[in-house]
């Protein structure tokens, strides 16, 4: 069981803070990326001194790669992943590798998801505050990767799931195969969000892309989950469900 911690939801524009403990969540507020926002954030950190924090970042400047690598353990695995990460993401400061599954045939190699923030200089001021205040930072993770645990908690067991978040700064679409992240993209970023009517088109284009890249099997039926407290994606849900050839969509 995890103990109490603060979850930091960071974007290039701001950072939000969630006070989390088992069975309970409390929103502490948002802090804009400005001198005053950083000062207020520092005060909040001081008031919660000693609590571990997890930083969940959401930005268009992210990259994901799926790699199949030899099944090795210990130091050999660490060295293998370090070489592969440096090869794939040459200049990235924040990067990581997550073992997802083991192949069932051949050499039974391991399948990894490699991820990196291509441009994450905007994170530096927030991390500097945490460093100065000696905050125990348990990790930095992309939002799409963190949502693997959300699917598990929601008991979503569909083999092919597209998770669609309507956010104040854009539309996040993430594809999960058997609960594991395979692809994600953020539409909008720092620009104003698109009109809700475009969401169904974006979902359809994403499905075509996944099929074209052979990430999503051509015959697979995509299960779409729409997260939108404002209800602005209702029209997208209706459009998707009206076409029997399309994905099946439902709101949560």
Where does each model-flagged region fall?
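Hydrophobic/aromatic-enriched cytosolic interaction surfaces used to assemble or bind macromolecules
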Residues: 1-252
């Amino acid at each position: 069981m995890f103990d109490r911690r603060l979850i930091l939801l960071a974007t290039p524009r701001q950072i939000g803070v969630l006070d989390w403990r088992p069975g309970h969540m409390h929103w502490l507020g948002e802090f804009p990326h400005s001198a005053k926002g950083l000062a207020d954030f520092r005060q909040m950190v001081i008031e919660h001194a000693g609590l571990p924090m997890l930083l969940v970042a959401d930005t268009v400047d992210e990259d994901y790669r799926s790699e199949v690598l030899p099944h090795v353990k210990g130091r050999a695995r660490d060295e293998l992943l370090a070489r592969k990460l440096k090869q794939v993401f040459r200049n990235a400061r924040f990067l990581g590798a997550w073992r997802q599954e083991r192949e069932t045939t051949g050499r039974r190699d391991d399948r990894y998801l490699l991820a990196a923030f291509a441009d994450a200089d905007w994170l530096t001021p927030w991390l500097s505050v945490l460093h100065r205040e000696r905050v125990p930072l348990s990790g930095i993770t992309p939002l799409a990767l963190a949502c693997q645990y959300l699917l598990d908690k929601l008991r979503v067991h569909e083999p092919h799931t597209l998770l669609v978040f309507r956010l104040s700064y854009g539309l996040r679409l993430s594809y999960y195969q058997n609960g594991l992240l395979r692809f994600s993209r953020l539409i909008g970023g720092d620009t104003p969000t698109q009109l809700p009517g475009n969401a169904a088109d974006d979902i359809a284009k994403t499905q075509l892309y996944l099929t074209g890249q052979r990430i999503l099997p051509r015959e697979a039926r995509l299960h779409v989950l729409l997260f939108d407290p404002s209800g602005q994606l209702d029209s997208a849900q209706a459009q998707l469900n009206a076409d029997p050839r399309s994905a099946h969509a439902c709101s949560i």
